[in-house]
């Protein structure tokens, strides 16, 4: 067959040669008669197999040129014949023959190659809303199901449509932005088998439908001459084809522009253009425009530069600089000011010498380019002596400026003196502002309101202070020798604020001659009166020397440097929800007594439940107590109600304040104070932790019994007086009480609580340290300072739970050797921080010092601190020189480290109680910590009605505001 084709081709060539030879004898052909060349074979398509020959002939009277196009690539041949001896798939394409007249004919050749069904050109680009051609033409037009398929079997988007052309490829219609990075294959069925082309990834160029987004870093700049000007312009668009530039109002400005571009996502192109003037000049001031445009349109944004030769400050008072305010009222002095560069120093000055800190300064706007500020001076409850000049001073690196307010305090007149002069004159001296007027009035008898005016003889005016802002003093006098009748003279001073009066009462009597007996009697009377006065003074002095009952716990209201301002406990509210009926209290034995009062064991019926009885401790005054002691006990009640409940303080349960003497009902702690508990347990102390011994089996909760025997045991509530002996209970039939875990819950029948006969070990001491630190952290969170933290002021109750207390009236400090006379007070000197001893400063940090002494007591099993050292001048000197106690016998090294940090001479270097809790928490066993955490969630008492408590405010040396309100309570 191939031989027959060659023979036919030979005849075709021969015919062509004959035409060429005879062409010269034929007439010329006009352009209108030109026809396209002829291609042999005369087909529009030709299918050959790979390896076969491709032979194409082009006939035309003139010269011809062959062009081969495949996958957008062109090849040319100037011969009339195009021959490919061994065809390949890449020879698939369109062959075009063009004559001299530009007319052409084409034939498309398919080179069928089973190994290469598709011709592929992998780069695939498409513009949004336009068509995109996937160049994967076929080499075999006879295959079926020619289409597109997603990679890895993934489906194509539902809205994707395409048109398949075996010669060109597959055209995706109306490309969308969502098609970006779409992976696909061309596919077809060949011989019943699906064939896939190489992978195509569609990259979509977004259609531009909006102008670029342009923004600058700041809308305006203010600079001093010589400073650098740098402004950043950010351009956002969907593609990088956006154009941008800076346009300067002053073309002479020398500026540099740096460009930085990047893509942030597929269709988010960003460009930064930073314009910089290294040293700005005044004539560089003006408008700078950042301009950007794309095919849709343009956008721009401007920034303004103002360059000044030097900085400035302009102050604008927001009120009249002359201010009148009444005595006791508040006034705010407000100024606004512009400053560039930023102000470095701002201050309010009183009378050009005294600084005041009751002011605040803040920017007028949060805008970065803001140069306007506001300063406010808050003057509260002004007194008459606080009038004067208040000056606001502000300065920056270049200039300073000020404005002065003249504040006048209007005060009600005050009668300073009213005297009878030797020359028969009555003189009245009054002071006030504005200038008071003094009028004189006369009335017969001893009336307190006179209406008959009397003209003054002499009136003098003087200023009561050096400055013109003080009270004005008026002297006025009248002659009373003209009055012939008994009566009253009123001196009445008044101004716009108010008035005040003083009265003179006088009577005219007959002259009486002295009697000879009168003088000795008068002398005797004067001597007796003098002696009585001396006796009264001595008794008063002794009374004042007597220690007064004072609430040790102090609640801090604010801190000014090293000065603590305490809340007056008498001003704290008392919620009558704490009231408990007196007739439901059944009093028992006295637990302890002091100079001012006593604590009595009692049974309260219906305190927790209506049908339940509970053993409580009731604090009350002695019948001989004075008013100050009664007020102090009420203050103690208010402080306890303010604090609220915590497991490690002696909590308030109720009170009786109506219908009789004040009674304060608190928790009853049956094991007494911790100091004597430690001393009792010295002989049975186990040096290692109890959990390491077999005795750990004894530590169990006993919840099946119905009554507590604690109240039946020997009373060891507290050491009220020296010399009281303590006897360890020895009932043979008592079971050993639970060490931890039998704490009373609100709705649970109380567990049996027996006298604690178990031994003491190191884990117990760590537990006591941890609990007391938790309790003190709670007090500190309520801004409460204890001032007398010691083992004697820690009580112990069921489950070896420690509770911090304030004995107050119930301790006989007069006979307690721990309290040393210092001035007219008795103080626990060995427990006090140096700043408390020498400067009478009590702070949260001084409580931390006392806690360190408490730890020493604890790990020495109740020894007295600074053993063998009397409190004398030598003791004070050693404390000043930094003497500290050595580690107690049973203290681990970590606990002694805590003691030493608590005894740091610098209060600010001492840890807080919260930090101490965290340090000790690392040393106690996990079981103890877990049990304590469970107990802390129990609330054994009725709800505390007090609300809105406070967290600890800043302590000594705090950098925060010097005066802070009480904040919302945070849990400890």
UniProtKB/Swiss-Prot annotation:
Binding site for Mg(2+): 564, 793, 806
Keyword ATP-binding: yes
Domain Protein kinase: 585-933
Pfam family, any one: ig
Cleavable signal peptide: 1-25
Spans annotated as Important for interaction with phosphotyrosine-binding proteins: 564-566
Native organism taxonomy: Eukaryota, Metazoa, Chordata, Craniata, Vertebrata
Gene Ontology biological process terms in this record: actin cytoskeleton organization; B cell differentiation; cell chemotaxis; cell migration; cytokine-mediated signaling pathway; detection of mechanical stimulus involved in sensory perception of sound; digestive tract development; embryonic hemopoiesis
Protein name: Mast/stem cell growth factor receptor Kit
Residues at the catalytic site: 788
Molecular function in Gene Ontology: ATP binding; cytokine binding; growth factor binding; metal ion binding; transmembrane receptor protein tyrosine kinase activity
Coiled coil: none
Main subcellular localisation: membrane
PANTHER family referenced in this protein's UniProt entry, alphabetically: MAST_STEM CELL GROWTH FACTOR RECEPTOR KIT (PTHR24416:SF46), TYROSINE-PROTEIN KINASE RECEPTOR (PTHR24416)
Gene designation per UniProt: KIT
Regions crossing the membrane: 521-541
Site positions for Interaction with SH2B2/APS: 564, 932
Phosphoserine PTM positions: 737, 742, 817, 887, 955
Post-translational modification: Ubiquitinated by SOCS6. KIT is rapidly ubiquitinated after autophosphorylation induced by KITLG/SCF binding, leading to internalization and degradation. Autophosphorylated on tyrosine residues. KITLG/SCF binding promotes autophosphorylation. Phosphorylated tyrosine residues are important for interaction with specific binding partners.
Regulation of catalytic or functional activity: Present in an inactive conformation in the absence of bound ligand. KITLG/SCF binding leads to dimerization and activation by autophosphorylation on tyrosine residues. Activity is down-regulated by PRKCA-mediated phosphorylation on serine residues.
Disulphide-bonded residues: 58-97, 136-186, 151-183, 233-290, 428-491
Residues where ATP binds: 592-599, 619, 667-673, 792
Ranges facing Extracellular side: 26-520
Span of domain Ig-like C2-type: 27-112, 121-205, 212-308, 317-410, 413-507
Catalytic activity, as annotated: L-tyrosyl-[protein] + ATP = O-phospho-L-tyrosyl-[protein] + ADP + H(+)
Keywords of this entry: ATP-binding, Cell membrane, Disulfide bond, Glycoprotein, Immunoglobulin domain, Kinase, Magnesium, Membrane, Metal-binding, Nucleotide-binding, Phosphoprotein, Proto-oncogene, Receptor, Repeat, Signal, Transferase, Transmembrane, Transmembrane helix, Tyrosine-protein kinase, Ubl conjugation
Residue(s) carrying Phosphotyrosine: 543, 549, 564, 566, 699, 717, 726, 819, 896, 932
């Amino acid at each position: 067959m191939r031989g027959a084709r060659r023979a036919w081709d030979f005849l075709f060539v021969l015919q062509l040669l004959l035409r060429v030879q005879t062409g010269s004898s034929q007439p010329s052909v006009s352009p209108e008669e030109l026809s396209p060349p002829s291609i042999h074979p005369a087909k529009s398509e030709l299918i050959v197999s790979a390896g076969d020959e491709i032979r194409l002939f082009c006939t035309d009277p003139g010269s011809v040129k062959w062009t081969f196009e495949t996958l957008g690539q062109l090849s040319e041949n100037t011969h009339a014949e195009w021959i490919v001896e061994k065809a390949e798939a890449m020879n698939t394409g369109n062959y075009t023959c063009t004559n001299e007249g530009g007319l052409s004919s084409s034939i498309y050749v398919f080179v069928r190659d089973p190994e290469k069904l598709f011709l592929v050109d992998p780069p695939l680009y498409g513009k949004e809303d336009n068509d995109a051609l996937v160049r994967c033409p076929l080499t075999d037009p006879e295959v079926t199901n020619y289409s597109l398929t997603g990679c890895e079997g993934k489906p194509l988007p539902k809205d994707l449509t395409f048109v398949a052309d075996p010669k060109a490829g597959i055209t995706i219609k109306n490309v969308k932005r969502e098609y970006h990075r779409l992976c696909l294959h061309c596919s077809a069925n060949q011989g019943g088998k699906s064939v896939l082309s190489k992978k195509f990834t569609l990259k979509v160029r977004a259609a531009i439908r909006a102008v670029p987004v342009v923004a600058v870093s700041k809308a305006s700049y203010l600079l001093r001459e010589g400073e650098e000007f740098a402004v950043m312009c950010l351009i956002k668009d969907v593609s990088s084809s956006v154009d941008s530039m800076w346009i300067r109002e002053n073309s002479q400005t020398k500026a540099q522009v740096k460009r930085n571009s990047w893509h942030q996502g597929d269709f988010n192109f960003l460009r930064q253009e930073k314009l910089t003037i290294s040293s700005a000049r005044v004539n560089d001031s003006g408008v700078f425009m950042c301009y950007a445009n794309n095919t849709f349109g343009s956008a721009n944004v401007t920034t303004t530069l103002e360059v000044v030769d030097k900085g400035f400050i302009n102050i604008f008072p927001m009120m009249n600089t002359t201010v009148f305010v009444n005595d006791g009222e508040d006034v705010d002095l407000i100024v606004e000011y512009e400053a560039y560069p930023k102000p470095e120093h701002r201050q309010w000055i009183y009378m050009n010498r005294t600084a005041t800190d009751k002011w605040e300064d803040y920017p007028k706007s949060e805008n970065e380019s803001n140069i306007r500020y506001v300063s406010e001076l808050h003057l509260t409850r002004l007194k008459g002596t606080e009038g004067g000049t208040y000056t606001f001073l502000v300065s920056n690196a270049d200039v300073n400026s000020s404005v002065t307010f003249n504040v006048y305090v209007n005060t009600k007149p005050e009668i300073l003196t009213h005297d009878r002069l030797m020359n028969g004159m009555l003189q009245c001296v009054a002071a006030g502002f504005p200038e008071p007027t003094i009028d004189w009035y006369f009335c017969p008898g001893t009336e307190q309101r006179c209406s008959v005016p009397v003209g003054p003889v002499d009136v003098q005016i003087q200023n009561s202070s050096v400055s013109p802002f003080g009270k004005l003093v008026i002297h006025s006098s009248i002659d009373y020798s003209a009055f012939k009748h008994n009566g009253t003279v009123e001196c009445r001073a008044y101004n716009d604020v108010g008035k005040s009066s003083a009265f003179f009462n006088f009577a005219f009597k007959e002259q009486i001659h002295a009697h000879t007996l009168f003088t000795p009697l008068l002398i005797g009377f004067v001597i007796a009166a003098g002696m009585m006065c001396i006796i009264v003074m001595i008794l008063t002095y002794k009374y004042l020397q007597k220690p007064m009952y004072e609430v040790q716990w102090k609640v801090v209201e604010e801190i000014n440097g090293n000065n603590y301002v305490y809340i007056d406990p008498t001003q704290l509210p008392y919620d009558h929800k704490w009231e408990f009926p007196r007739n439901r209290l059944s009093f028992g034995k006295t637990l302890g007594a002091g100079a001012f009062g006593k604590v009595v064991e009692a049974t309260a019926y219906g305190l927790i439940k209506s049908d339940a009885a509970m053993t409580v401790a009731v604090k009350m005054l002695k019948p001989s107590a004075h008013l100050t002691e009664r007020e102090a006990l009420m203050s103690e009640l208010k402080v306890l109600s303010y604090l609220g409940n915590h497991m490690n303080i002696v909590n308030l349960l109720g009170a009786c304040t109506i219908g009789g003497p004040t009674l304060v009902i608190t928790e009853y702690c049956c094991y007494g104070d911790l100091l004597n508990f430690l001393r009792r347990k010295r002989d049975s102390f186990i040096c290692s932790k109890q959990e390491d011994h077999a005795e750990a089996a004894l530590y169990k909760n006993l919840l099946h019994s119905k009554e507590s025997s604690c109240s039946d045991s020997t009373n060891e509530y507290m050491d009220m007086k020296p010399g009281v002996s303590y006897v360890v209970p020895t009932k043979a039939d008592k079971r050993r009480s639970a060490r931890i875990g039998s704490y009373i819950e609100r709705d649970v029948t109380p567990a049996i609580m027996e006298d604690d006969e178990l031994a003491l070990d190191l884990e117990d001491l760590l537990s006591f340290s941890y609990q007391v630190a938790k309790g003190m952290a709670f007090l500190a969170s309520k801004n409460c300072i204890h001032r007398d933290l010691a083992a004697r002021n820690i009580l112990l109750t069921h489950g070896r739970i420690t509770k911090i207390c304030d004995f107050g009236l119930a301790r006989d400090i007069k006979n307690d050797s721990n309290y040393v006379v210092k001035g007219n007070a008795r103080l626990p000197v060995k427990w006090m921080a140096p700043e408390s001893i020498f400067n009478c400063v009590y702070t949260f940090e001084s409580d931390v010092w006392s806690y360190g002494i408490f730890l020493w007591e604890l790990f020495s099993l109740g020894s007295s601190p600074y053993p063998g050292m009397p409190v004398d001048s030598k003791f004070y000197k050693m404390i000043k020189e930094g003497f500290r106690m050595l580690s107690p016998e049973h203290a681990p090294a970590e606990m002694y480290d805590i003691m030493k940090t608590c005894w740091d001479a610098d209060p600010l270097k001492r840890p807080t109680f919260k930090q101490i809790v965290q340090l000790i928490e690392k040393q106690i066993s996990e079981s103890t910590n877990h049990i304590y955490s469970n107990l802390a969630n129990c609330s054994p008492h009725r709800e505390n009605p007090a609300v809105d408590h406070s967290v600890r405010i800043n302590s000594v040396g705090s950098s925060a505001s010097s005066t802070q309100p009480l904040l919302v309570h945070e849990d400890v």
